[in-house]
UniProtKB/Swiss-Prot annotation:
It is found in: Nucleus. Its main location: nucleus. The gene is SPY. This is Probable UDP-N-acetylglucosamine--peptide N-acetylglucosaminyltransferase SPINDLY. Residues 897-911 have a biased composition (Polar residues). Belongs to the glycosyltransferase 41 family. O-GlcNAc transferase subfamily. TPR repeats lie at residues 34-67, 68-101, 102-135, 143-176, 177-210, 211-244, 252-285, 286-319, 320-353, 355-387, 388-421. Keywords: Gibberellin signaling pathway, Glycosyltransferase, Nucleus, Repeat, TPR repeat, Transferase.
């Protein structure tokens, strides 16, 4: 690095008089005299024999004290022996004798400069130049000292004066590279980067091996986002100076940024390569390790992600983002205790880290710790009032606690902040089902508007290569994240098992986050029958659409609707000529790209007033076919026989138990002396939720001592055996149970339900009627109460029904997988025939929509804003219409790493994805000759 002193003289300045000829020294050992003595002294000095030369100069001066050449020579020798004051006396005396002696004046300037007297040094050099304009040494040293003066003034805060001195230096010596360099430093600090870059380029032009200039040029290019140019500059710098630590660190930063850039552009493998190359230049660079963790998380290589997050923490123990993202991984692995530990560690580093506050709240929500969850999410909002996903998760919390109105309000607040929030948009639609009685079209309109907005984010296919042969074997695709022990799995098992694989090639697109034994059983079954199983978890929805087209799927059936981890983005692309929605959601998806919605004539009567974007296709029997769990265990006797009292119960989630439902239940319990109520759902592990529920029933006249509240039971066998606690199951409304109703009936417990005007209200109607218990379907609240009281009045009849109910159910259409699948295949074939005849409901719908909006949806650019790597809260609840819960995982790369909350990393679940956090970003410092700065820390950036 260039020093302020510039070049050292060390006798290099030529002597003015006489000279240093090349004559050999006298043969005799006696000291020469006169002119010979002076010539010999100059020779000795040129050979760095300063002591011997000094003796001769002194001899000469003893005889001729005004000999300027001897005075200068003696001064140089004294200067070389670190005797600057004595040397200055010699040079000063020489100037007295010869005021125009440029050499003596220059040496005076050198001593003044060495002593820090820059002004005096400059004056001496200027006098030397005036005395002899051709004397190059004076100009060179004047340029150096003017540059040093400029730096001193700049450091003292006098920037303009400093610039003036640098410019004066260049007027003196237009080739003096450090002056250009220091001007570059000043203009960089003044944010005038174009001027600074020009100065650095001139410095490098004058001095091609000027490593610092290339380093700082790299800083400017990097800060402009011109990473390739920055890396080229750092590479040139390190070629010149391989051990230049600042440049090596800056190279690591630029490579990390480049890795993040190419990763975001879709080349994650190249991104990983750049991150690893960054570690070659700085093996302890925590940001590169952190971003490797994010990348491996996005590649679903969570073991490697954990390794690099741990390494990032080792080299930067203050990296709260690494702690946060580790928490996301552990949460997704169901290691909730470890996840909580990681989030708490992140918060110990950054107490107001909104992503970790949010994520901790989400875990507490999953655990049913509603009070703790609310506290964390509210703190996240307090830390960042515009943190949209925190409001989304607050909505999930309210939903789980049964406060649907507050839930919808929270989702709408999220959408006010971020109108493109997919999670909040879909969660809002789901929540509205819990309180919709079908009295108006508000919910339909909400779905339709969401669908129109969502479709604009995707380009739609409008032609397919699938041969239009009416009766050829069909390729049926099923797409869902719920091919594990989840409510949907009990209803999709029948077609996976009973499809005629010679007539229907089945392709399963499994988005399961964490596979279990049921997942493996399904996969084995499909593959053995000749089907195809594709694991699509973590794959972009547009890429999934490409897979569907490559598989030439004729009919694509989505099983999720607006619940967690759905692939409606794939459906919006319309990769299959026929698209269907079934079983995962109790309402229209709102997507114009979906042709049909499968139902039956009881869940959606032919004269229904409920509107759907899709065309309804009614199966001949029930639209549901239940495959019981082999872990269910035997039916237990009616508990009233041994208890001496009737126990009513419900295992539906709390969101379905509306105030009106509680009023009706209280009427029933109050009318049956000594009867009890047992309710099981996740939030009841929270004391405040329990107390609120009991207090509401108390206000309705039901003593809390008659109510048993159970939290979520995780083991399926234990959950099913819990039905042995109840004699009669009470369904919810207007959102009826589905899986809970089937479980209740299978365990011998009759269920009372109520018909309504919307699909969600009538699922129980369909199930009970097809099982042969249509008599337990009420049309009004009074009839609902009456039916429950009638059942409770005859314990013997209850016992008889309990003994026969499982067999009755197994023999009914609700459990007849073979017949159900034949009916489903017939419906698929009818859809296909219509398509072959040119009838496509979705295409007609899209044409109308395009005409209405004046847009060509088929040419819409596919870009979903902030769709970061999502990790959503898909919990296996009883009926498990899971809302989308977003975790924030953070991702950073160089200047503005965008995690993925999740969507893109882990930051979010948006696991990596995402909302993404504010990690520490290493910012390039500017190295100057005075005080080269390495790296400094500043807040960067959204993951994911």
């Amino acid at each position: 690095m260039e020093s302020l002193q510039g070049k050292e003289s060390n006798g290099a300045v030529p002597v003015c008089n006489g000279g240093g000829g090349a004559a050999a020294p006298p043969a005799k050992q006696q000291l020469p005299e006169g002119t010979d003595a002076l010539r010999y002294a100059n020779i000795l000095r040129s050979r760095n024999k300063f002591a011997d030369a000094l003796q001769l100069y002194t001899t000469v001066l003893d005889k001729d004290g005004a000999n300027v050449e001897a005075l200068i020579g003696k001064g140089i020798c004294l200067q070389a022996q670190s005797l600057p004051r004595q040397a200055l006396d010699c040079f000063t005396e020489a100037v007295k004798v010869d005021p125009k002696n440029a050499c003596a004046l220059t040496h005076c300037g050198m001593i003044y400069k060495d002593e820090g007297h820059l002004v005096e040094a400059a004056e001496a050099y200027q006098k030397a130049r005036s005395a002899d304009p051709s004397y190059k040494a004076a100009s060179e040293f004047l340029a150096i000292v003017l540059t040093d003066l400029g730096t001193s003034l700049k450091l003292a805060g006098n920037t303009e004066d400093g610039i003036q001195k640098y410019c004066e230096a260049l007027e003196v010596d237009s080739h003096y590279a450090p002056a250009y360099y220091n001007l570059g430093v000043v203009y960089s600090e003044m944010m005038q980067f174009d001027v600074a870059l020009t100065c650095y380029e001139k410095a490098a032009l004058e001095r091609p091996l000027y490593a610092e200039a290339y380093c700082n040029m790299g800083v400017i290019y990097k800060n402009r986002g011109e990473l390739d140019a920055a890396i080229a500059c750092y590479d040139r710098c390190l070629t010149i100076s391989p051990n230049f630590e600042i440049a090596k660190n800056n190279m690591a930063i630029a490579l990390t940024d480049l890795g993040t850039k190419v990763k975001i552009e879709g080349d994650i493998n190249q991104g990983v390569a750049y991150y690893k190359k960054a570690l070659f230049y700085n093996w302890h660079y925590a940001d590169a390790m952190y971003n490797l963790g994010v990348a491996y998380g996005e590649m679903l290589n969570f073991e490697m992600a954990i390794v690099f997050y741990e390494l990032a923490l080792h080299f930067n123990p203050r990296c709260a983002e690494a702690c946060n993202n580790l928490g996301v991984i552990y949460k997704d692995r169901d290691n909730l205790d470890k996840a909580v530990e990681c989030y708490q560690m992140a918060l110990s580093i950054k107490p107001n880290f909104s992503q970790s506050l949010n994520n901790l709240g989400v875990v507490y929500t999953v655990q049913g710790k509603m009070d703790a969850a609310a506290s964390m999410i509210e703190k996240a909002i307090l830390a960042n009032p515009t943190y949209a996903e925190a409001y989304n998760n607050l909505g999930v919390l309210y939903r789980d606690a049964g406060s649907i109105t507050l839930s919808v309000q929270a989702y709408e607040r999220c959408l006010q902040i971020d109108p493109d929030s997919r999670n909040a948009g879909q969660n809002r639609l789901l929540a509205m089902n819990y309180i919709d009685e079908g009295s108006d079209d508000k919910l339909y309109d909400a779905h339709r508007e969401w669908g129109k907005r969502f479709m604009k984010l995707y380009a739609q296919y409008t032609s397919w290569d699938n041969p239009k042969v009416a009766d050829r074997p069909l390729v049926i695709g099923y797409v869902s994240p719920d091919f594990f022990t989840h409510s949907v799995s009990y209803f999709v098992e029948a077609p996976l098992t009973h499809h005629d694989y010679t007539k229907c090639k089945v392709v399963v697109y499994s988005g399961v986050v964490k596979a279990d034994a049921k997942t493996l059983r399904f996969k084995d079954k499909v593959l053995k029958k000749g089907g195809v199983w594709r694991d699509i978890y973590g794959i972009d929805e547009k890429k999934v659409a490409t897979l569907v087209r490559e598989d030439k799927v004729d009919i694509l059936v989505e099983l999720t609707g607006h619940t967690a981890n759905n692939k409606l983005g794939t459906m919006a692309c319309r990769p299959a000529p026929i698209q269907v929605t079934w079983i995962g959601y109790p309402n229209t998806t709102g997507l114009p790209a979906i042709d049909y919605r499968i139902t039956d004539s009881l869940a959606d009567s032919p004269n229904t007033n409920q509107k759907h974007v899709e065309e309804l296709v009614r199966l001949p029997e029930s639209f549901l076919c239940y495959t019981p769990s082999p872990e269910a265990g035997p039916v237990c006797p009616t508990p009233a026989i041994s208890n001496g009292f009737i126990t009513f119960g419900s295992f539906n989630n709390l969101a379905k138990i509306t105030p009106k439902v509680m009023q009706v239940w209280a009427r029933i319990l109050c009318a049956v002396p000594n009867s009890r109520l047992v309710v099981k759902c996740k939030p009841f592990c929270c004391d405040s939720i329990r107390q609120k529920f009991l207090s509401t029933l108390e206000e309705l006249g039901l003593e809390s001592l008659r109510v048993d509240l159970l939290p979520l039971i995780h083991l399926n066998h234990d959950h099913m055996q819990a039905y042995s606690l109840m004699d009669i199951s009470l369904d919810t409304f207007p959102y009826a149970g589905t899986t809970t109703t089937c479980e209740s009936l299978y365990m011998g417990v009759p269920c009372v339900t109520m018909a309504g005007s919307v699909h969600a209200h009538n699922v129980g109607v369909s199930l009970l009627t097809k099982v042969g218990l249509g008599r337990l379907v009420a049309k009004t609240e009074d009839e609902y109460v009456s039916l429950a009281l009638d059942l409770a009045s005859d314990v013997s009849a209850l016992e008889e029904l309990r003994k026969s109910l499982r067999e009755l159910m197994i023999k009914s259409p609700v459990c007849d997988g073979e017949s159900f699948t034949r009916g489903l295949e017939s419906a698929y074939r009818s859809m296909w025939h219509r398509y072959c005849d040119g009838d496509s409901p979705a295409l007609r719908r899209l044409e109308v929509l395009a005409d209405q909006t004046g847009e060509d949806l088929n040419k819409t650019a596919v870009k979903l804003a902030d769709l970061k790597a999502q990790r959503v809260n898909a919990t296996a609840e009883e009926d498990n219409q899971s809302p989308v819960t977003k975790f924030d995982a953070t991702s950073k790369g160089g200047e503005q790493p965008q995690p993925q909350i999740m969507v893109n990393g882990v930051t979010s679940p948006e696991g990596n994805q995402a909302v993404k956090a504010q990690p520490q970003i290493m910012v390039n410092g500017v190295s100057s000759p005075h005080s080269p700065s390495g790296r400094c820390e500043a807040n960067g950036h959204s993951s994911r």
